[in-house]
């Protein structure tokens, strides 16, 4: 058998069919999962390139394998482009994920048992910020800060009080479900008072930071981590940024050989492509549209009587609090899914329900904005979501309404382009 003549359709019909069906699913639903997006065909092409064949342990010009001349060029391009994008002095583009980017920073700056202070899961934080089931909660003495119980906004006074009390080695700013801006300068003030390191995890808002639509943490944080998908609209992966090159040197050693082995050179090439796209003027317009669309979505749901956490949004995330409506997040997300609208159940701050059930849903605008949705389209989407939620108030069997909304979704989504 000549492997170089094989294609997927002939080699593995089952996987080929799965990919075809997934393409159909992605093309036919309104995608509101806040952490998802659609990459360009150029990113897909780079990600599927033969660079996947190349082992390249180490860093450009310091590899443990020969034959790395071309992949060195690709990685250097990715590094230089992302440094320009975020206006920083140091970048590492090798992390396989945002979680591993965070782990590399921990490995570089902390010792087991050190205290870390991060946002609690139910307030919108991430597993890797000290949650008990995660490595960060097992290896370190994790302390959590919450949001204000009335406004649901970050409580900087509480963070300062906890920092004074616990003297963390690392203070973490960042979230996976928080719809408002973060004051990174205020975090740095707190850090300087207690002599801690400051890490900003901007996985969700990296695109906003890169385009100036959110305050940059680069001047304030010792290390900045992110994913390369979500609002950056690149391949799935991670990155680490800093203006402190001495810390950057520690992070390089922590990531390789400390945490990872060979980098994924096809993914790094795809990251470089995405960063080039992010440097174009139209990307800033895209991010501005993402934010405007989120505000339109939040307003349309508020008009229908639904509680939007914090009263609105500054970014791409809309959190719907369903406690007063007597609907669980799980029930709502499943019903919306059957109606062709994909989102996720999400905990609400101080949520007393199980994280597998939750009292809210998280909605996001990056993916549909990539397809061309504008504010008026998200107003329609908001009403579709509200229709489904209204139906659930009366009856958990929402099948008739789900079919009606699915028909509306189909008519709307057909107006917007997808991969050919």
Curated annotation (Swiss-Prot):
Residue(s) at site: Plays an important role in substrate specificity: 229
Record-level GO BP terms: glycine biosynthetic process from serine; tetrahydrofolate interconversion
The enzyme's E.C. designation: 2.1.2.1
CDD domains cross-referenced by the UniProt entry: SHMT
Record: residues binding (6S)-5,6,7,8-tetrahydrofolate: 121, 125-127, 354-356
InterPro entries: PyrdxlP-dep_Trfase (IPR015424), PyrdxlP-dep_Trfase_major (IPR015421), PyrdxlP-dep_Trfase_small (IPR015422), Ser_HO-MeTrfase (IPR001085), Ser_HO-MeTrfase-like (IPR049943), Ser_HO-MeTrfase_PLP_BS (IPR019798), SHMT-like_dom (IPR039429)
Record PTM N6-(pyridoxal phosphate)lysine, positions in chain: 230
UniProtKB keywords: Amino-acid biosynthesis, Cytoplasm, One-carbon metabolism, Pyridoxal phosphate, Transferase
GO cellular component, one term: cytosol
Subunit structure: Homodimer.
NCBIfam families: PRK00011.1 (NF000586)
Cited function: Catalyzes the reversible interconversion of serine and glycine with tetrahydrofolate (THF) serving as the one-carbon carrier. This reaction serves as the major source of one-carbon groups required for the biosynthesis of purines, thymidylate, methionine, and other important biomolecules. Also exhibits THF-independent aldolase activity toward beta-hydroxyamino acids, producing glycine and aldehydes, via a retro-aldol mechanism.
Name of protein: Serine hydroxymethyltransferase
Gene: glyA
